[in-house]
Curated annotation (Swiss-Prot):
This is Shikimate kinase. The gene is aroK. GO terms for molecular function: ATP binding; magnesium ion binding; shikimate kinase activity. InterPro entries: P-loop_NTPase, Shikimate/glucono_kinase, Shikimate_kinase/TSH1. Its cofactor is Mg(2+). Monomer. It is an enzyme of class 2 (transferase). Keywords: Amino-acid biosynthesis, Aromatic amino acid biosynthesis, ATP-binding, Cytoplasm, Kinase, Magnesium, Metal-binding, Nucleotide-binding, Transferase. SUPFAM superfamilies: P-loop containing nucleoside triphosphate hydrolases (SSF52540). It catalyses: shikimate + ATP = 3-phosphoshikimate + ADP + H(+). Catalyzes the specific phosphorylation of the 3-hydroxyl group of shikimic acid using ATP as a cosubstrate. Pathway: Metabolic intermediate biosynthesis; chorismate biosynthesis; chorismate from D-erythrose 4-phosphate and phosphoenolpyruvate: step 5/7. It comes from Clostridium botulinum (strain Hall / ATCC 3502 / NCTC 13319 / Type A). One of its GO terms (biological process) is amino acid biosynthetic process. Belongs to the shikimate kinase family.
Amino acid sequence: MENIVLIGMPLSGKSTLGRELSKILKYDLIDTDTLIEEMEDKSIKEIFKIYGEDYFREKELKIINKLKKESNKVISTGGGLPIYNKNIYELKKIGFTVYLKVPLEELIKRMVKKEYDTRPLLKNNDTKFLEEMYKNRIEIYEKAHTIICNTNYKESLITIVRAYKKWKGI
């Protein structure tokens, strides 16, 4: 499949870079969290509160299975999607996976800068929780096809496009 799949921690820039990549490549953008919100007619926060995290992860898995038939998409995943059910391996079947790596210190700055009420796992700007999440997830994220240090927006876009074209053999 010829898709780009963006993975990484919450606040790593997946949605922002995804929008720009989709414009550059003229691919449709699929944001898995937004898709789930539309399917459920509820916010992610409400879904977690009413049904719990396991229910949410089941919805993510259904989306992955639907995306296996798609091409020419930029897919921005929720931060936990690659982690659960060994989904990283399923994502690699869907397309070119890109881990947007952001240093923990930068993620903490981004979290503290704004209040992220919509993100159920980042409630109360808990830096210790974010640090623990980072440590638990990094090894799985690093299984992506390529790793981009996403601290410079324009450089990240250029690097992703180049790596994707190389992967495709262009």
